[in-house]
Amino acid sequence: MINIRKTHPLMKILNNAFIDLPTPSNISSWWNFGSLLGLCLIMQILTGLFLAMHYTPDTSTAFSSVAHICRDVNYGWFIRYLHANGASMFFICLYAHIGRGLYYGSYMFQETWNIGVLLLLTVMATAFVGYVLPWGQMSFWGATVITNLLSAIPYIGTTLVEWIWGGFSVDKATLTRFFAFHFILPFIITALAAVHLLFLHETGSNNPTGIPSNMDMIPFHPYYTTKDILGALFLILALLALTLFTPDLLGDPDNYTPANPLSTPAHIKPEWYFLFAYAILRSIPNKLGGVLALLLSILILIFIPMLQTSKQRSMMFRPFSQLLFWTLIADLLTLTWIGGQPVEHPYIIVGQLASILYFLLILVLMPTVSLIENKLLKW
């Protein structure tokens, strides 16, 4: 009798995606982050569901409902901090996943890559609206500053901002709709992730060499299921260590002060995972220019496949491109640091230089160096 997993309509889909899936035999631990992102998403949906059972999306009670979760609900503090730090782990995995794609040329699977960029934008939107929900000072002012950026759009900007706010400032209507968005978006992310996988399984996985591996495939189970479980254990260990030892390490102390529209915090800044984009936004003195640079800093990923000038897909055998790649990583870390600093000398000029270097590396230097490498190899 043929195995049920190969005949049953539902089991067949799961079998072809996670059990009998032909996988390159040489993919490294950098390929673990896809499954880790799936794990993060499941954890965030579960912890978020339990938080939503006790949270009230109302300006007068939101802050105290979060305090109530932490003080009175059984293990509420644990669920809350798992959710908050889970978001940080989500972004760490996300950035590692994108970095892997850039390094090994996975962006040449264009449909998979474009869905991935869409996923990144959706996760960023989810994290942003989620940060507003505790209704602390940084929640309120972060929401005010970021939504206000839309007013830079000519002609319709102001109307658009008031439409998103549901009034003339960030208030009860804004909080209620942000809670609704924060609840629905993870399910949209889940659907997009399924489409992401669908397109990936059309082509099969890339591998570190960037050379097609059709002649050397192994089944996903048990080899990569085991490997993914090990990765998951490390992720859970890191998340638990962060949550149980230093739960507020990555948070902002201002968010322990209830939102007050009459008092502006000294330094308004987003969560750490948005600081690089925030630094690029602030480095341009013009409002519309800043907003466009902010958008382009993320949307530039869509153009990466078009900027591929190398005859080799992966950077594995391209030392000059590797140097530029790690320069880009260092530049992003610099931008992240600058985004958390006050707007004063020397941070302003460092931020501007780092922003220029970011776009210069991606749009000019990397494609040019790839062409030089082709010449050196007489290709």
From Swiss-Prot:
GO terms for cellular component: mitochondrial inner membrane; respiratory chain complex III. InterPro entries: Cyt_b/b6_C, Cyt_b/b6_C_sf, Cyt_b/b6_N, Cytb/b6-like_sf, Cytochrome_b, Cytochrome_b_C_euk/bac, Cytochrome_b_N_euk/bac, Di-haem_cyt_TM. Its cofactor is heme b. Keywords: Electron transport, Heme, Iron, Membrane, Metal-binding, Mitochondrion, Mitochondrion inner membrane, Respiratory chain, Transmembrane, Transmembrane helix, Transport, Ubiquinone. One of its GO terms (biological process) is mitochondrial electron transport, ubiquinol to cytochrome c. Binds 2 heme b groups non-covalently. This is Cytochrome b. It comes from Lagenorhynchus australis.
